[in-house]
């Protein structure tokens, strides 16, 4: 029994001597599921409890590694503190909400900036496509295509792996195994380059560096060189964030201007359509098209003889006296009704219509008081036929 206990104790000491201390930071946008991921790590992997109250720091024991996991917030203020932990981390876990397609462009910008940072370039990165349980979640192949991971990996010389996962508490453990598989891959990639990564690891620890609200606890001050480096990095990140905010604001203003112009065009078009449907008088339309309109006139037509034969007047050609005497000087006037309003104003005026000739003999015979002049008319019937006059319309 003593030998058995001695063998177990010696084996535990050898295992503790081989354990490697690894620091990993978990980052991503807000509401991507980072806190649920760390909770899943604690459920699936044995963890080591600390006496200090550090809710954002978790220590895991997996294989031959003692892993310190730091959960960093993903809001705008929390992202400003990310560069303070790049140099201390051996590897990174980047959590992506695969169901939020609207923010995939924002994820692309942040991940590109992260991988091109000198303190992160060359370090292994595990990308977890979280919330795969949702209906519209993107597949890992789609995420690789959207984020252009192949180009980023080739340019930054960083190892990268995309693993689908879901961090729901009620999900069975067998469906949460991709989380453990991804973490094992990350630790194996760190173990292959552990010595190289440790040389890049700066002497101050994470607890000493942190002075923000993300990680609690008081620590020592950083060295002047590391502080100046971080100050330059923070200034650059502030400039980049200011530039991105300005670009986003300009793009939003451009989109609003386009919507305003489209709305104005639609309203003007509706106004023109409404005007075309409204009833308008005909006169302005015709005057606009160049038509000439004549005013209406109430015209009367008078029928009359061109020449009135008086008593004792003879024929001009023969010279014989005319003894015929008209019984009365009646003029046959008839008034035509005024043209109606519906008459076509644009028709040409009709030519004067020639009326059939009237025989004076017939006129006198119809007159009862012309009996006294029958003899004269009978004697000069041939002459009177020549003296018949024509009637015209006079306007």
From Swiss-Prot:
Disulfide bridge positions per record: none
Keyword Nucleotide-binding: yes
A single BP term in Gene Ontology: receptor localization to non-motile cilium
InterPro entries in the record: Ciliary_GTPase, P-loop_NTPase, Small_GTPase_ARF/SAR
PANTHER family with a match to the protein in the record: ADP-RIBOSYLATION FACTOR-LIKE PROTEIN 13A (PTHR46090:SF1), ADP-RIBOSYLATION FACTOR-LIKE PROTEIN 13B (PTHR46090)
The keyword GTP-binding belongs to this UniProt entry's keyword annotation: yes
Stated name of the protein: ADP-ribosylation factor-like protein 13A
Annotated Gene Ontology cellular component terms: ciliary membrane; motile cilium; non-motile cilium
Gene: Arl13a
Family that this chain belongs to: Belongs to the small GTPase superfamily. Arf family.
Native source species: Rattus norvegicus
Gene3D superfamilies, per database record: P-loop containing nucleotide triphosphate hydrolases
An MF annotation (GO) of this entry: GTPase activity
Protein keywords: GTP-binding, Nucleotide-binding
Sequence positions that bind GTP: 28-35, 71-75, 130-133
């Amino acid at each position: 029994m003593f030998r058995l206990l001695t063998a177990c104790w010696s084996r535990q000491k050898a295992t503790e001597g081989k354990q490697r201390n690894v620091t990993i930071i978990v980052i991503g946008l807000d509401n991507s599921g980072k806190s649920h991921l760390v909770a899943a790590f604690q459920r699936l992997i044995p963890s080591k409890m600390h006496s200090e109250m550090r809710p954002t720091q978790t220590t895991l024991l997996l294989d031959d590694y003692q892993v310190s996991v730091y959960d960093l917030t993903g809001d705008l203020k929390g992202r400003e503190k990310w560069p303070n932990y790049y140099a201390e981390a051996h590897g990174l876990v980047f959590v992506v909400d695969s169901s939020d397609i609207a923010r995939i462009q924002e994820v692309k910008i942040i991940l590109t900036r992260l991988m091109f940072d000198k303190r992160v370039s060359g370090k292994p990165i595990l990308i977890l496509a979280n919330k795969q349980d949702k209906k519209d979640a993107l597949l890992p192949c789609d995420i690789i295509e959207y984020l252009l991971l192949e180009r980023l990996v080739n340019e930054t010389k960083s190892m990268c792996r995309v693993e689908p996962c879901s961090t729901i508490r009620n999900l069975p453990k067998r469906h949460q195994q991709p989380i453990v598989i991804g973490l094992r891959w990350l630790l194996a990639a760190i173990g292959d380059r552990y010595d190289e990564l440790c040389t890049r690891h700066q002497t101050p620890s994470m607890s000493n560096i942190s002075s923000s609200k993300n990680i609690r606890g008081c620590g020592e001050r950083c060295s002047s060189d590391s502080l100046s480096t971080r100050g330059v990095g923070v200034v650059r990140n502030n400039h980049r964030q200011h530039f991105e905010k300005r670009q986003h604001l300009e793009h939003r203003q451009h989109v609003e201007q386009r919507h305003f112009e489209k709305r104005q065009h639609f309203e003007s078009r509706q106004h023109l359509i409404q005007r075309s449907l409204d009833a308008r008088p005909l006169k302005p339309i015709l005057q606009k098209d160049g038509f000439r309109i004549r005013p209406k006139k109430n015209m009367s037509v008078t029928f009359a003889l061109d020449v009135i034969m008086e008593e004792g007047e003879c024929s001009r050609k023969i010279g014989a006296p005319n003894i015929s005497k008209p019984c009365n000087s009646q003029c046959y006037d008839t008034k035509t009704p005024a043209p109606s309003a519906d008459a076509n104003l644009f028709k040409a005026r009709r030519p004067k219509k020639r009326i059939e000739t009237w025989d004076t003999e017939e006129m006198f015979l119809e007159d009862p008081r012309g009996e006294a002049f029958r003899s004269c008319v009978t004697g000069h019937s041939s002459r009177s036929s020549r003296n018949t006059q024509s009637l015209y319309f006079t306007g």
